[in-house]
Amino acid sequence: MSGIQPIPVPRDVLWRSQSAGRRSTPSVTVPVPGAELRAGQPPAVMVATSSDFEPRLRSERVTRLFNVVVASCMLVAASPIMLLAAIAVRLSSRGPVFYLQERVGLDRRWNRTRAINERRREDLGGAPFTIYKFRSMRVDAEVNGQAVWAKKDDDRVTRVGKFLRASRIDELPQLLNVLRGDMNIVGPRPERPSIFVRLREQIAEYPVRQRVRPGITGLAQVSNPYDQTLDDVRRKVAFDMEYMRRQSLLEDLRIMLKTVPVMLLRIGGW
């Protein structure tokens, strides 16, 4: 980080936690805009408050149209691969082809006057939705439905599942989530409610990610491997905040292009 000068934060804005209704002024370490971001290395950073991450105003209709068109084209192009993946999952292990899971989505309340006093089911920071994936684990991977953080060389992952996860093919059904309006192609990855609540308690700025629609891929995903520790999550949150700073359709296209080698060369991670 030599040559990087600290950037002063001009003001602090009080931010009330949606989870507990308490007033606080959390800060987050994020990459300095314009600094080179490299996987496996901490980015050049500055300290800023949550208010600095308000997403840029963009035409919702243009953004929605862009995502629908791209998702539709990708769905058509990827349909042969998805068909082969479905057959492989079905023949290789007992259980359904698709894995449906609840995730925390966009929080539409953050910019409304009464948002701070509203509470959702399970006190989540966004609207829950069902995410679609090709099943990559055994059907008994989670005891009693309790969320278990996936780890490297997880023995719950099937042989076919290892390939699907490494190539990110297991995420392709989420193109349907994009068409439904649950997700965008690019954005912060959505998390399960129980894990979201835990991370929100340990990383003060974590709920800020919900101010934009979650995505299939993102800056954090093309820059980092699978997260296995809390520090890994903090690092990905920093990249998510940087994405929110420079969010644009051109930035989305750039991340989409960077996702291609991630899939083909099996680098980076979700």
For the regions a language model picked out, list residue spans one by one.
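Flexible acidic/glycine-rich loop/turn elements at helix↔coil and beta-strand↔loop transitions
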Residues: S93, T229-D231
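Short Ser/Thr-interspersed hydrophobic loop/turn segments at strand-loop and sheet-helix junctions
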Residues: A88, S223-N224
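Acyl/amide activation-and-transfer machinery of modular secondary-metabolite enzymes
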Residues: V233-M241
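A short, structured surface patch at a secondary-structure boundary
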Residues: M137-R138, A150-R213, M256-M263
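A hydrophobic, helix-centered structural microdomain
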Residues: E54-D140, L249, R254-W270
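A short, polar/charged loop-to-alpha-helix boundary motif
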Residues: D140-V148
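Long, intrinsically disordered, low-complexity Ser/Thr/Pro-rich regulatory/activation regions
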Residues: V212-Q221
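N-terminal hydrophobic signal-anchor/signal peptide
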Residues: M1-V76, V97, Y243-R245, W270
